[in-house]
């Protein structure tokens, strides 16, 4: 079985459980008595835990095993799902978020490093961007199907959206254990500290990698959309209607990855396209924040997701082109540690801004508008100073 196909299978299974929570995640938290501001604060803690866990988990992935790192991610994800099944308020939800955050840190860097080196062993380095883009397309359709099924589950008991995660995470663990040992490990093995020193040295000398990390920090403003879209659209379409809203939104995500897959530019030369994708996310959020009714904001958030769908595979291709095998996972974690700072700062600022405001669509629209402006200003500025090679 080709490495790319193994990667697609693993990624689809690993994403399916979380996908079933997306449409009802915020309604579930609201049912626990949390406010919109507290949801943002919870999200800030999630990203803080994930970011602080990035570097040690990435070093272990290179020094110990990338397959081991992926399996540990599955274990923490399963425990996080169990914790959410029994969550009763903010503190218990926080424990669940922290478990999931550590799990996501084990995945981060190790996934991209595994498939990049597995492709190299097969002599398929030239397919790297296409593989990342295809994985995004598959992920898009998995998220659409999972979101629809999650809406059906939420109609009977919103808490049960976490139950599938308890089963899909062990299934993903099994795929890694049976199919992903060996071929995705580093070509040249380094110790954890050697991988860390090499990663820091590369970042110090590479203007292009420093540029993309700053762009990732700016991109963190998209987190304002993640947990507010369902409270925004639920009064307009109902709980079940969120499933088709989610489908329309995420189909835009998947189609954008198809566009990335067809790009003919050389690998590693994606800087202008990365900036363009962030501009699209900003235009989408600003437009959604200024719109009213259903169709105008829906069209705007589809554009927003189109930009997000382009961003991830473009960044993966841009970075992996510049990083050597022995420390891919460690550098990926260092990149996430720095680049995801925006994902921590943004929800904290949102909480500080709206914690005394009502849980209304107008509050959400204001947040989207401001975050969209940040995305536009940041992306356009960085486009002007983008690396040319």
Show the residue positions of the predicted features.
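C-terminal transmembrane helical hairpin of 12-TM major facilitator-type secondary transporters
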Residues: 271-312
